[in-house]
Amino acid sequence: MSRNYNDELQFLDKINKNCWRIKKGFVPNMQVEGVFYVNDALEKLMFEELRNACRGGGVGGFLPAMKQIGNVAALPGIVHRSIGLPDVHSGYGFAIGNMAAFDMNDPEAVVSPGGVGFDINCGVRLLRTNLDESDVQPVKEQLAQAMFDHIPVGVGSKGVIPMNAKDLEEALEMGVDWSLREGYAWAEDKEHCEEYGRMLQADPNKVSPRAKKRGLPQLGTLGAGNHYAEIQVVDEIFNEYAAKKMGIDHKGQVCVMIHSGSRGLGHQVATDALVAMEKAMKRDKIIVNDRQLACARIASPEGQDYLKGMAAAGNYAWVNRSSMTFLTRQAFAKVFNTTPDDLDLHVIYDVSHNIAKVEQHVVDGKERTLLVHRKGSTRAFPPHHPLIAVDYQLTGQPVLIGGTMGTCSYVLTGTEQGMTETFGTTCHGAGRALSRAKSRRNLDFQDVLDKLADMGIAIRVASPKLVMEEAPESYKNVTDVVNTCHDAGISKKAIKLRPIAVIKG
Protein backbone atom coordinates (compact mmCIF):
# COMPACT_ATOMS: atom_id res chain seq x y z
CA MET A 1 0.00 0.00 0.00
CA SER A 2 1.68 3.20 -1.11
CA ARG A 3 1.36 6.39 0.91
CA ASN A 4 0.13 9.64 -0.53
CA TYR A 5 2.15 12.84 -0.54
CA ASN A 6 0.61 14.19 2.67
CA ASP A 7 1.38 10.95 4.51
CA GLU A 8 4.99 11.21 3.37
CA LEU A 9 5.27 14.77 4.72
CA GLN A 10 4.71 13.54 8.27
CA PHE A 11 8.16 11.95 8.16
CA LEU A 12 9.89 15.19 7.20
CA ASP A 13 10.64 18.12 9.43
CA LYS A 14 12.69 21.27 9.06
CA ILE A 15 15.65 21.49 11.48
CA ASN A 16 16.65 25.01 10.39
CA LYS A 17 16.43 27.19 7.30
CA ASN A 18 18.98 25.09 5.40
CA CYS A 19 18.37 21.58 6.69
CA TRP A 20 15.54 19.04 6.75
CA ARG A 21 15.31 15.77 8.70
CA ILE A 22 13.97 12.49 7.28
CA LYS A 23 12.57 10.53 10.21
CA LYS A 24 12.74 6.78 10.64
CA GLY A 25 9.76 5.10 9.03
CA PHE A 26 9.92 7.19 5.83
CA VAL A 27 11.19 3.96 4.25
CA PRO A 28 11.44 0.54 5.96
CA ASN A 29 14.36 -0.55 8.19
CA MET A 30 16.03 2.84 8.62
CA GLN A 31 18.94 2.38 11.07
CA VAL A 32 19.56 6.14 11.35
CA GLU A 33 17.80 9.33 10.29
CA GLY A 34 18.39 11.12 7.01
CA VAL A 35 19.03 14.83 6.49
CA PHE A 36 19.26 17.03 3.43
CA TYR A 37 20.54 20.57 2.98
CA VAL A 38 18.56 23.03 0.81
CA ASN A 39 17.58 26.66 0.43
CA ASP A 40 14.09 27.78 -0.66
CA ALA A 41 14.63 27.26 -4.39
CA LEU A 42 16.29 23.84 -3.98
CA GLU A 43 13.71 22.77 -1.38
CA LYS A 44 10.96 23.33 -3.94
CA LEU A 45 12.71 21.03 -6.45
CA MET A 46 13.13 18.27 -3.83
CA PHE A 47 9.48 18.33 -2.76
CA GLU A 48 8.21 18.53 -6.36
CA GLU A 49 10.20 15.40 -7.16
CA LEU A 50 8.64 13.59 -4.19
CA ARG A 51 5.15 14.79 -5.12
CA ASN A 52 5.56 13.59 -8.72
CA ALA A 53 6.75 10.20 -7.50
CA CYS A 54 3.67 9.87 -5.27
CA ARG A 55 1.56 10.47 -8.38
CA GLY A 56 3.45 7.70 -10.11
CA GLY A 57 5.52 9.94 -12.38
CA GLY A 58 8.92 8.40 -11.57
CA VAL A 59 12.16 9.81 -12.98
CA GLY A 60 13.60 7.42 -15.56
CA GLY A 61 13.50 4.41 -13.24
CA PHE A 62 15.15 6.13 -10.27
CA LEU A 63 13.42 6.78 -6.96
CA PRO A 64 13.18 10.41 -5.81
CA ALA A 65 16.32 11.63 -4.06
CA MET A 66 14.59 11.83 -0.65
CA LYS A 67 13.61 8.15 -0.86
CA GLN A 68 17.15 7.26 -1.90
CA ILE A 69 18.59 9.09 1.13
CA GLY A 70 16.16 7.08 3.27
CA ASN A 71 17.09 3.76 1.67
CA VAL A 72 20.78 4.44 2.31
CA ALA A 73 19.90 5.07 5.97
CA ALA A 74 18.65 1.46 6.03
CA LEU A 75 22.01 -0.06 5.00
CA PRO A 76 23.76 -2.24 7.60
CA GLY A 77 26.48 -0.54 9.66
CA ILE A 78 25.62 3.07 8.75
CA VAL A 79 26.48 5.59 11.48
CA HIS A 80 25.11 9.00 12.51
CA ARG A 81 22.88 9.72 9.49
CA SER A 82 22.46 9.53 5.73
CA ILE A 83 23.23 12.97 4.31
CA GLY A 84 21.95 14.69 1.16
CA LEU A 85 23.86 17.77 0.03
CA PRO A 86 22.19 20.71 -1.75
CA ASP A 87 23.03 19.41 -5.24
CA VAL A 88 21.41 16.03 -4.54
CA HIS A 89 19.57 14.37 -7.45
CA SER A 90 18.42 10.82 -8.04
CA GLY A 91 21.03 8.35 -9.26
CA TYR A 92 21.85 4.64 -9.34
CA GLY A 93 21.28 3.29 -5.79
CA PHE A 94 22.55 6.27 -3.86
CA ALA A 95 21.38 9.69 -5.00
CA ILE A 96 24.19 11.77 -6.49
CA GLY A 97 25.06 14.17 -3.69
CA ASN A 98 24.30 11.60 -0.96
CA MET A 99 27.10 10.67 1.44
CA ALA A 100 27.13 8.04 4.17
CA ALA A 101 29.68 6.53 6.55
CA PHE A 102 29.90 2.93 7.76
CA ASP A 103 31.61 1.63 10.88
CA MET A 104 34.71 -0.39 9.94
CA ASN A 105 34.54 -2.23 13.27
CA ASP A 106 30.98 -3.43 12.74
CA PRO A 107 31.14 -6.89 11.11
CA GLU A 108 27.76 -6.23 9.45
CA ALA A 109 28.84 -2.91 7.85
CA VAL A 110 28.81 -2.77 4.06
CA VAL A 111 30.46 -1.12 1.09
CA SER A 112 28.19 -0.26 -1.84
CA PRO A 113 29.45 0.60 -5.35
CA GLY A 114 26.26 2.64 -5.82
CA GLY A 115 27.60 4.88 -3.05
CA VAL A 116 30.65 5.74 -5.13
CA GLY A 117 29.12 5.79 -8.58
CA PHE A 118 30.17 4.44 -11.97
CA ASP A 119 32.69 7.16 -12.72
CA ILE A 120 35.09 6.32 -9.88
CA ASN A 121 37.12 9.35 -8.77
CA CYS A 122 35.38 11.66 -11.14
CA GLY A 123 36.88 14.88 -9.87
CA VAL A 124 38.14 18.37 -10.51
CA ARG A 125 41.58 19.92 -10.69
CA LEU A 126 42.27 23.64 -10.72
CA LEU A 127 45.44 25.22 -12.12
CA ARG A 128 46.40 28.85 -11.65
CA THR A 129 48.42 31.06 -13.99
CA ASN A 130 50.09 34.46 -13.66
CA LEU A 131 48.15 35.62 -16.71
CA ASP A 132 45.42 38.19 -16.66
CA GLU A 133 42.14 38.18 -18.58
CA SER A 134 43.57 40.96 -20.80
CA ASP A 135 46.51 38.66 -21.75
CA VAL A 136 44.20 35.84 -22.78
CA GLN A 137 41.32 37.71 -24.42
CA PRO A 138 43.15 38.45 -27.74
CA VAL A 139 44.31 34.81 -28.11
CA LYS A 140 41.29 33.15 -26.52
CA GLU A 141 40.19 31.31 -29.67
CA GLN A 142 43.74 30.12 -30.38
CA LEU A 143 44.10 28.93 -26.80
CA ALA A 144 40.79 27.04 -26.87
CA GLN A 145 41.85 25.47 -30.17
CA ALA A 146 45.30 24.56 -28.83
CA MET A 147 43.74 22.84 -25.82
CA PHE A 148 41.19 21.08 -28.03
CA ASP A 149 44.05 19.88 -30.27
CA HIS A 150 46.21 18.74 -27.37
CA ILE A 151 43.60 17.00 -25.21
CA PRO A 152 41.72 14.11 -26.84
CA VAL A 153 38.00 14.60 -26.20
CA GLY A 154 34.73 12.70 -26.54
CA VAL A 155 33.20 9.31 -25.85
CA GLY A 156 35.57 7.01 -27.71
CA SER A 157 38.55 9.34 -27.64
CA LYS A 158 42.03 7.81 -27.46
CA GLY A 159 44.96 9.19 -25.51
CA VAL A 160 48.15 10.67 -26.94
CA ILE A 161 50.32 9.65 -24.00
CA PRO A 162 52.03 6.42 -25.07
CA MET A 163 51.00 3.56 -22.82
CA ASN A 164 51.31 -0.20 -22.97
CA ALA A 165 49.76 -2.85 -20.73
CA LYS A 166 52.69 -2.77 -18.29
CA ASP A 167 52.43 1.04 -17.98
CA LEU A 168 48.73 0.70 -17.20
CA GLU A 169 49.41 -1.83 -14.40
CA GLU A 170 51.92 0.57 -12.88
CA ALA A 171 49.65 3.60 -13.28
CA LEU A 172 46.80 1.73 -11.54
CA GLU A 173 49.07 0.98 -8.62
CA MET A 174 51.02 4.24 -8.42
CA GLY A 175 48.62 7.02 -9.40
CA VAL A 176 50.33 10.42 -9.67
CA ASP A 177 53.66 8.79 -8.73
CA TRP A 178 53.56 7.12 -12.15
CA SER A 179 52.97 10.47 -13.89
CA LEU A 180 55.82 11.95 -11.88
CA ARG A 181 58.21 9.17 -12.81
CA GLU A 182 57.26 9.39 -16.49
CA GLY A 183 57.71 13.17 -16.57
CA TYR A 184 54.04 14.12 -16.94
CA ALA A 185 53.72 15.79 -13.53
CA TRP A 186 55.65 18.18 -11.30
CA ALA A 187 56.69 17.02 -7.84
CA GLU A 188 54.57 19.69 -6.16
CA ASP A 189 51.40 18.62 -8.05
CA LYS A 190 51.18 15.63 -5.77
CA GLU A 191 51.11 17.70 -2.57
CA HIS A 192 47.97 19.38 -3.84
CA CYS A 193 45.94 16.26 -4.58
CA GLU A 194 43.50 14.59 -2.26
CA GLU A 195 45.23 11.38 -1.02
CA TYR A 196 48.39 12.85 -2.61
CA GLY A 197 47.09 11.38 -5.86
CA ARG A 198 47.64 7.77 -4.83
CA MET A 199 45.39 5.37 -2.97
CA LEU A 200 47.69 2.87 -1.33
CA GLN A 201 45.25 -0.04 -1.15
CA ALA A 202 45.02 -0.17 -4.96
CA ASP A 203 45.53 -3.62 -6.47
CA PRO A 204 45.62 -3.79 -10.29
CA ASN A 205 44.87 -7.53 -10.08
CA LYS A 206 41.39 -6.65 -8.86
CA VAL A 207 40.69 -4.74 -12.07
CA SER A 208 39.27 -7.10 -14.70
CA PRO A 209 40.96 -7.59 -18.09
CA ARG A 210 37.86 -6.07 -19.70
CA ALA A 211 38.18 -2.91 -17.56
CA LYS A 212 41.88 -2.64 -18.44
CA LYS A 213 41.10 -3.06 -22.10
CA ARG A 214 38.65 -0.15 -21.87
CA GLY A 215 41.12 1.95 -19.87
CA LEU A 216 44.28 1.48 -21.90
CA PRO A 217 43.45 3.70 -24.90
CA GLN A 218 41.62 6.34 -22.86
CA LEU A 219 44.33 7.66 -20.58
CA GLY A 220 44.76 11.42 -20.70
CA THR A 221 41.42 11.88 -22.44
CA LEU A 222 38.46 14.03 -21.55
CA GLY A 223 35.29 11.95 -21.36
CA ALA A 224 31.92 13.02 -22.65
CA GLY A 225 29.01 13.81 -20.36
CA ASN A 226 29.70 16.44 -17.75
CA HIS A 227 33.45 16.37 -18.32
CA TYR A 228 35.20 19.47 -19.54
CA ALA A 229 38.26 21.65 -19.39
CA GLU A 230 37.60 25.34 -18.88
CA ILE A 231 39.72 28.46 -19.03
CA GLN A 232 38.35 30.64 -16.26
CA VAL A 233 38.97 34.03 -14.71
CA VAL A 234 38.66 35.02 -11.06
CA ASP A 235 35.37 36.89 -10.77
CA GLU A 236 35.15 37.45 -7.02
CA ILE A 237 37.33 36.80 -3.98
CA PHE A 238 35.36 36.16 -0.77
CA ASN A 239 38.29 35.19 1.44
CA GLU A 240 41.51 37.02 0.57
CA TYR A 241 43.66 35.11 3.04
CA ALA A 242 42.63 31.70 1.68
CA ALA A 243 42.88 32.91 -1.93
CA LYS A 244 46.44 34.19 -1.40
CA LYS A 245 47.46 30.83 0.04
CA MET A 246 46.18 29.32 -3.21
CA GLY A 247 48.20 31.81 -5.28
CA ILE A 248 45.16 33.86 -6.28
CA ASP A 249 45.63 37.55 -5.58
CA HIS A 250 43.38 39.56 -7.88
CA LYS A 251 40.19 39.55 -9.92
CA GLY A 252 40.79 38.77 -13.59
CA GLN A 253 43.54 36.21 -12.85
CA VAL A 254 43.33 33.28 -15.29
CA CYS A 255 42.84 29.67 -14.10
CA VAL A 256 42.17 26.33 -15.79
CA MET A 257 39.71 23.80 -14.43
CA ILE A 258 39.83 20.16 -15.54
CA HIS A 259 36.86 17.93 -14.76
CA SER A 260 37.27 14.25 -15.56
CA GLY A 261 37.31 10.75 -14.10
CA SER A 262 38.26 7.14 -14.68
CA ARG A 263 36.44 6.80 -18.02
CA GLY A 264 35.43 3.30 -19.17
CA LEU A 265 37.81 1.61 -16.73
CA GLY A 266 36.04 2.90 -13.61
CA HIS A 267 32.65 2.10 -15.10
CA GLN A 268 33.69 -1.50 -15.69
CA VAL A 269 35.13 -1.87 -12.15
CA ALA A 270 31.76 -0.75 -10.75
CA THR A 271 29.79 -3.04 -13.07
CA ASP A 272 31.97 -6.06 -12.22
CA ALA A 273 31.59 -5.39 -8.49
CA LEU A 274 27.80 -5.09 -8.68
CA VAL A 275 27.58 -8.51 -10.33
CA ALA A 276 29.84 -10.13 -7.69
CA MET A 277 27.95 -8.42 -4.85
CA GLU A 278 24.51 -9.57 -5.94
CA LYS A 279 25.71 -13.14 -5.32
CA ALA A 280 27.41 -12.21 -2.04
CA MET A 281 24.19 -10.62 -0.76
CA LYS A 282 22.30 -13.88 -1.23
CA ARG A 283 25.05 -15.79 0.56
CA ASP A 284 25.32 -13.36 3.47
CA LYS A 285 21.56 -12.71 3.60
CA ILE A 286 21.92 -8.95 3.31
CA ILE A 287 18.58 -7.25 2.73
CA VAL A 288 18.32 -3.81 1.11
CA ASN A 289 15.31 -1.68 0.15
CA ASP A 290 16.37 -1.16 -3.46
CA ARG A 291 18.22 -3.71 -5.54
CA GLN A 292 20.39 -0.94 -6.98
CA LEU A 293 21.93 -0.71 -3.49
CA ALA A 294 23.82 -3.96 -4.05
CA CYS A 295 26.55 -4.12 -1.40
CA ALA A 296 28.88 -6.50 0.41
CA ARG A 297 30.23 -6.65 3.94
CA ILE A 298 33.37 -4.54 4.09
CA ALA A 299 35.41 -7.48 5.37
CA SER A 300 34.08 -10.00 2.80
CA PRO A 301 36.23 -11.01 -0.20
CA GLU A 302 33.82 -9.13 -2.51
CA GLY A 303 33.97 -6.00 -0.35
CA GLN A 304 37.77 -6.07 -0.21
CA ASP A 305 38.12 -6.80 -3.94
CA TYR A 306 35.92 -3.83 -4.76
CA LEU A 307 37.82 -1.45 -2.45
CA LYS A 308 41.14 -2.50 -4.03
CA GLY A 309 39.77 -2.24 -7.57
CA MET A 310 38.07 1.09 -6.80
CA ALA A 311 41.37 2.47 -5.44
CA ALA A 312 43.13 1.40 -8.66
CA ALA A 313 40.44 3.13 -10.74
CA GLY A 314 40.88 6.17 -8.48
CA ASN A 315 44.61 6.17 -9.25
CA TYR A 316 43.82 5.91 -12.96
CA ALA A 317 41.67 9.06 -12.70
CA TRP A 318 44.50 10.96 -10.97
CA VAL A 319 46.90 9.89 -13.70
CA ASN A 320 44.28 10.99 -16.22
CA ARG A 321 43.97 14.48 -14.69
CA SER A 322 47.79 14.67 -14.45
CA SER A 323 48.09 13.81 -18.14
CA MET A 324 45.57 16.49 -19.04
CA THR A 325 47.46 18.96 -16.85
CA PHE A 326 50.61 18.11 -18.81
CA LEU A 327 48.77 18.69 -22.10
CA THR A 328 47.25 21.95 -20.83
CA ARG A 329 50.70 23.20 -19.80
CA GLN A 330 51.95 22.34 -23.31
CA ALA A 331 49.07 24.16 -24.99
CA PHE A 332 49.54 27.33 -22.91
CA ALA A 333 53.32 27.27 -23.39
CA LYS A 334 52.84 26.96 -27.15
CA VAL A 335 50.37 29.85 -27.46
CA PHE A 336 52.33 32.19 -25.16
CA ASN A 337 55.68 31.01 -26.49
CA THR A 338 57.20 30.43 -23.05
CA THR A 339 57.48 27.65 -20.44
CA PRO A 340 54.68 26.36 -18.19
CA ASP A 341 56.89 27.29 -15.24
CA ASP A 342 57.09 30.92 -16.34
CA LEU A 343 53.30 30.97 -16.62
CA ASP A 344 53.08 29.72 -13.00
CA LEU A 345 50.81 26.86 -14.11
CA HIS A 346 50.65 25.26 -10.68
CA VAL A 347 47.97 22.93 -9.33
CA ILE A 348 45.91 24.71 -6.66
CA TYR A 349 44.15 21.48 -5.70
CA ASP A 350 42.63 18.27 -7.07
CA VAL A 351 39.55 16.75 -5.44
CA SER A 352 37.51 13.63 -5.95
CA HIS A 353 33.71 13.73 -6.20
CA ASN A 354 33.05 9.96 -6.32
CA ILE A 355 35.03 7.81 -3.89
CA ALA A 356 34.88 5.69 -0.75
CA LYS A 357 37.67 5.92 1.79
CA VAL A 358 38.70 4.98 5.28
CA GLU A 359 38.79 7.99 7.63
CA GLN A 360 38.82 8.76 11.34
CA HIS A 361 35.80 10.71 12.60
CA VAL A 362 34.34 11.52 15.99
CA VAL A 363 30.83 10.09 16.36
CA ASP A 364 28.93 10.56 19.64
CA GLY A 365 32.12 11.69 21.35
CA LYS A 366 34.15 8.62 20.29
CA GLU A 367 36.72 8.47 17.52
CA ARG A 368 35.78 5.78 15.03
CA THR A 369 37.28 4.35 11.87
CA LEU A 370 34.71 4.73 9.13
CA LEU A 371 34.33 3.87 5.47
CA VAL A 372 33.05 7.16 4.08
CA HIS A 373 31.13 6.94 0.79
CA ARG A 374 31.09 10.22 -1.10
CA LYS A 375 29.09 10.19 -4.31
CA GLY A 376 28.67 13.53 -6.00
CA SER A 377 30.10 15.15 -2.91
CA THR A 378 33.51 16.47 -1.92
CA ARG A 379 35.83 15.99 1.01
CA ALA A 380 36.10 19.32 2.85
CA PHE A 381 38.50 18.94 5.77
CA PRO A 382 38.91 21.82 8.23
CA PRO A 383 42.04 23.82 9.10
CA HIS A 384 44.76 21.86 10.97
CA HIS A 385 43.56 18.47 9.66
CA PRO A 386 46.56 16.11 9.35
CA LEU A 387 45.51 14.88 5.88
CA ILE A 388 45.71 18.23 4.09
CA ALA A 389 48.80 19.83 2.58
CA VAL A 390 51.02 22.09 4.68
CA ASP A 391 50.10 25.17 2.57
CA TYR A 392 46.43 24.79 3.50
CA GLN A 393 46.77 23.95 7.19
CA LEU A 394 45.55 27.42 8.18
CA THR A 395 42.83 27.86 5.57
CA GLY A 396 41.23 24.42 5.51
CA GLN A 397 41.20 22.16 2.46
CA PRO A 398 40.33 23.82 -0.86
CA VAL A 399 37.11 22.39 -2.31
CA LEU A 400 36.56 22.72 -6.06
CA ILE A 401 33.00 23.11 -7.27
CA GLY A 402 32.56 22.95 -11.04
CA GLY A 403 29.50 24.75 -12.28
CA THR A 404 27.92 23.59 -15.50
CA MET A 405 29.23 24.48 -18.86
CA GLY A 406 29.22 28.24 -19.17
CA THR A 407 28.17 29.06 -15.60
CA CYS A 408 30.45 30.03 -12.74
CA SER A 409 32.55 27.70 -10.58
CA TYR A 410 33.66 28.13 -6.98
CA VAL A 411 36.52 27.33 -4.64
CA LEU A 412 35.39 26.73 -1.05
CA THR A 413 37.26 25.79 2.11
CA GLY A 414 36.43 23.09 4.65
CA THR A 415 35.15 23.88 8.16
CA GLU A 416 35.12 22.35 11.63
CA GLN A 417 31.30 22.40 11.56
CA GLY A 418 31.34 20.30 8.39
CA MET A 419 33.54 17.82 10.24
CA THR A 420 30.90 17.28 12.93
CA GLU A 421 27.78 17.52 10.75
CA THR A 422 28.71 15.89 7.44
CA PHE A 423 31.92 13.91 8.07
CA GLY A 424 33.92 16.72 6.47
CA THR A 425 31.88 16.69 3.26
CA THR A 426 30.23 19.34 1.11
CA CYS A 427 28.55 19.70 -2.30
CA HIS A 428 30.26 18.94 -5.61
CA GLY A 429 28.57 21.04 -8.26
CA ALA A 430 25.21 22.04 -9.56
CA GLY A 431 23.25 18.78 -9.58
CA ARG A 432 20.87 17.92 -12.44
CA ALA A 433 17.37 19.34 -12.48
CA LEU A 434 16.41 17.78 -15.87
CA SER A 435 17.29 14.25 -16.96
CA ARG A 436 19.64 13.90 -19.93
CA ALA A 437 16.89 12.63 -22.24
CA LYS A 438 14.56 15.45 -21.19
CA SER A 439 17.31 18.01 -21.84
CA ARG A 440 17.75 16.65 -25.36
CA ARG A 441 14.01 16.91 -25.98
CA ASN A 442 13.60 20.39 -24.52
CA LEU A 443 16.71 22.23 -25.64
CA ASP A 444 18.21 22.91 -29.04
CA PHE A 445 21.99 22.60 -29.21
CA GLN A 446 22.42 25.59 -31.52
CA ASP A 447 20.63 27.81 -28.98
CA VAL A 448 22.93 26.58 -26.26
CA LEU A 449 26.05 27.26 -28.33
CA ASP A 450 24.77 30.70 -29.40
CA LYS A 451 24.06 31.62 -25.81
CA LEU A 452 27.61 30.73 -24.79
CA ALA A 453 28.97 32.75 -27.71
CA ASP A 454 26.81 35.72 -26.64
CA MET A 455 28.41 35.51 -23.21
CA GLY A 456 31.80 35.78 -24.92
CA ILE A 457 32.76 32.19 -24.18
CA ALA A 458 34.93 30.39 -26.74
CA ILE A 459 33.71 26.82 -27.12
CA ARG A 460 35.09 23.62 -28.68
CA VAL A 461 32.83 20.58 -28.55
CA ALA A 462 33.50 17.08 -29.86
CA SER A 463 29.84 15.95 -29.88
CA PRO A 464 27.35 18.83 -30.22
CA LYS A 465 24.34 16.64 -29.39
CA LEU A 466 25.68 16.27 -25.85
CA VAL A 467 25.69 20.01 -25.38
CA MET A 468 22.01 20.16 -24.48
CA GLU A 469 22.42 17.55 -21.78
CA GLU A 470 24.96 19.82 -20.14
CA ALA A 471 23.28 23.15 -20.82
CA PRO A 472 22.98 25.36 -17.73
CA GLU A 473 19.18 24.94 -17.95
CA SER A 474 19.57 21.20 -17.25
CA TYR A 475 21.07 21.90 -13.83
CA LYS A 476 20.25 23.43 -10.49
CA ASN A 477 21.80 26.83 -9.92
CA VAL A 478 25.35 26.31 -8.66
CA THR A 479 25.28 29.59 -6.70
CA ASP A 480 22.20 28.35 -4.78
CA VAL A 481 24.02 25.12 -4.00
CA VAL A 482 27.24 26.81 -2.83
CA ASN A 483 25.40 29.46 -0.79
CA THR A 484 23.36 26.77 0.96
CA CYS A 485 26.56 25.01 2.06
CA HIS A 486 28.07 28.35 3.10
CA ASP A 487 24.99 29.39 5.10
CA ALA A 488 24.76 25.94 6.70
CA GLY A 489 28.43 26.32 7.71
CA ILE A 490 29.64 23.03 6.18
CA SER A 491 32.00 24.91 3.83
CA LYS A 492 32.89 28.55 3.24
CA LYS A 493 33.18 30.45 -0.04
CA ALA A 494 36.69 31.58 -1.03
CA ILE A 495 36.73 32.33 -4.78
CA LYS A 496 34.25 32.57 -7.65
CA LEU A 497 35.43 31.87 -11.22
CA ARG A 498 33.70 32.48 -14.54
CA PRO A 499 34.51 30.72 -17.82
CA ILE A 500 35.94 32.39 -20.91
CA ALA A 501 36.54 29.18 -22.88
CA VAL A 502 35.12 25.65 -22.68
CA ILE A 503 36.59 22.47 -24.18
CA LYS A 504 34.19 19.57 -24.04
CA GLY A 505 33.75 15.92 -24.96
Swiss-Prot record:
Q: Which reaction does it catalyse?
A: a 3'-end 3'-phospho-ribonucleotide-RNA + a 5'-end dephospho-ribonucleoside-RNA + GTP = a ribonucleotidyl-ribonucleotide-RNA + GMP + diphosphate; a 3'-end 2',3'-cyclophospho-ribonucleotide-RNA + a 5'-end dephospho-ribonucleoside-RNA + GTP + H2O = a ribonucleotidyl-ribonucleotide-RNA + GMP + diphosphate + H(+)
Amino-acid positions noted as binding Mn(2+) 2 in the UniProt annotation, renumbered to this chain = C122, H259, H353
The record's EC number reads 6.5.1.8
Ligand binding (GMP): 226-230, 353-354, 402-405, 409, 428-431, 504
**Where does it live in the cell?**
Nucleus; Cytoplasm
GO terms for CC? Answer: cytoplasm; cytosol; endoplasmic reticulum membrane; nuclear envelope; nucleoplasm; nucleus; tRNA-splicing ligase complex
Q: Which positions are annotated as binding Mn(2+) 1?
A: D119, C122, H227
Residues at the catalytic site: H428
- Cite the GO molecular-function annotations of the record: GTP binding; metal ion binding; RNA ligase (GTP) activity; vinculin binding
Q: Which keywords accompany this UniProt record?
A: Cytoplasm, GTP-binding, Isopeptide bond, Ligase, Manganese, Metal-binding, Nucleotide-binding, Nucleus, Phosphoprotein, tRNA processing, Ubl conjugation
Entry's Gene Ontology BP terms: in utero embryonic development; placenta development; tRNA splicing, via endonucleolytic cleavage and ligation
Can you quote the record's cofactor note? Binds 2 manganese ions per subunit.
Q: Which location does the Swiss-Prot or TrEMBL entry give for the cross-link Glycyl lysine isopeptide (Lys-Gly) (interchain with G-Cter in SUMO2)?
A: K496
**Gene3D superfamilies from the entry?**
tRNA-splicing ligase RtcB
* Induction record: Down-regulated in the epididymis upon castration.
Reported function: Catalytic subunit of the tRNA-splicing ligase complex that acts by directly joining spliced tRNA halves to mature-sized tRNAs by incorporating the precursor-derived splice junction phosphate into the mature tRNA as a canonical 3',5'-phosphodiester. May act as an RNA ligase with broad substrate specificity, and may function toward other RNAs. Essential during post-implantation development of embryos.
Among PANTHER family, the record links this protein to: RNA-SPLICING LIGASE RTCB HOMOLOG
* The name this protein goes by in its record: RNA-splicing ligase RtcB homolog
**What organism does the record attribute this protein to?**
Mus musculus (Mouse)
- Name of encoding gene: Rtcb
